[in-house]
Amino acid sequence: MRNTLLPIVGLGLLMAAAPGLAHHALATTYDTRQSIVLKGTVMKINWENPHVHLYLQADDKTAPDWEFELGSPNMQIQNGWKLDTFRRGDHVVVTAYPARNGSRLGYASKVSLSSH
């Protein structure tokens, strides 16, 4: 019985971990071999688990808004961010990995205030 139970339990644990591993596989959604730099105005920022999301209207204003995923709220706080570090209307520069599917989605690796 023990020889049969161990592989079943092991398989169950592996299957339970798979969604978490897939969720955190950055390279499946974003092209980590290249980065983009965009300047624009913060439209909104959502501090929600599992990730902070920043919505940006690019300076050219002809393009649709961009959405940038960041780390978890806890990770952003550990990196020195506060809930009011960036506010609606702030002009920022975002460096990000673009979405593989060509959508206006990216994973932000750096966000900083811009002087225009």
Go through each PLM region and give its residues:
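OB-fold/S1-family single-stranded nucleic acid-binding modules
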Residues: A99-H116
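A short macromolecule-binding patch
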Residues: K61-S72
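Conserved hydrophobic positions within beta-strands
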Residues: G40-V42
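Short boundary/loop segments of OB/S1/cold-shock single-stranded nucleic-acid-binding domains
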Residues: G20-I36
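Short nucleic-acid-contacting surface segments enriched for D/E, G, S/T with interspersed K/R
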Residues: I77-V94
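Bacterial N-terminal signal peptides that target proteins for export
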Residues: M1-V9
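Short aromatic-glycine-enriched beta-strand elements
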Residues: E48-A58
